[in-house]
Amino acid sequence: KAFVPAKLEAYISLACSASIPVSEPKGIVVVHDPETVFYDDVILVNGLESLRPKVTIEKNYETKLSSCDGLGLMSPELAKRWAEEVEEDYLPAGVCIRNAFCKGMAFTFDFKAFASEIAQTEEIVDVWGYKHNINDIELVLTTSMLKLWDSYSSIEDYLDKSRRNGHTFALTKITDEELDNEQTMNYQFLQSLELEDDDIYNLIKPTLDEIDDILNYDYRKTLTYLRGVNLTEKTVVRPPFDYTTAMMIDKDMLNDPYTYSKIRNNIKNRIDQVKLGVINVHGNFSILSGDPYTLCQSMFNLPVTGLLKRGEIYSYYWQSRGVKEVAGFRAPMTVHNNIVVKQIANNDEVNKWYKYMNTVTILNAWDNACATLNGADFDGDTIMTTDNEYVLKGIKPTLPIVCLQGASSK
């Protein structure tokens, strides 16, 4: 079979990813990626017809979206076992996996409950046409994850050849147990916002207040800044044993000339960062996911609708705080069109089916959010979200940029 050399070398190098080996799942199935079709007004960049891309505004443009590009599903039982194997004591929302010619995120989702309650069948058919009982499956892979799936005759053929060549499943990343409450912006995220002078002042005020508190001998704010927001009174004193450790033992060390000089030098660097746009906002980075409900619908041959509507995302973090709307950014960002503003879904259905995905951001399958976020997919990409009122106020409506590019074969 013919391959594009560059792609083949990239697939081969997946085995070199820094990762932690884990046990093989007890039952694996490979299914096709779901696809949705919708219509949207877009800025179309067509690079297929000439050397110089043609840019046009297209009304009601037909978009075909691979709504689960780069993601698969793992059962809660597998998530628990893998977490224990990498010495984590919580149930992760997802893990980034590797194996021979295989990469992507596996998110924790109860697809067996879906089979019982929604599909009302235990049988699914894989990409090779073989039937499987979903109750015997722990890991669902998609064709976008298993790059050379059509070079094998079955999942057993793939696993057997992987084992014989020394390959195994491994994890490169695991989702956090909790998301941060505060995140820093950067110049890319800020430079295109339309802000009045008062808005700019209010946007940077929390950062200025933090610096002012530290310079004015606020012991707790200083320790939080130096050692991180997760520091508590019960935190065990541990390395590095430096002036910050001394402050944790005795808060009066803040009055020591050497200690205070170290803090001032640190703050000078922080002030330089602020000038470059590194300012604090309420928000965090989280891993992106497509709508796993669409994948379940697709693999059981049901109409693909998903649970999220156009313009919606699911985020337990924001939903649990009563937030209705957030702005989303993905680095690298190049233009204002790369910013999304989304509504937070909150209903019984999403809360039930996404209950294990509490630290990820789930995109809907019915808009161009992936294109807007500079070609995001779901194999480990992250999004920074914030509910900051001045950031939201400074975002102006723009059309998504959709780029048409030629795709080479495998």
Each model region followed by its residue ranges:
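Conserved small-residue
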Residues: K1-A371, L392-K393, K410
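Conserved catalytic alpha/beta cores of large enzymes that bind or transform nucleotide phosphates
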Residues: D367, L373-K410
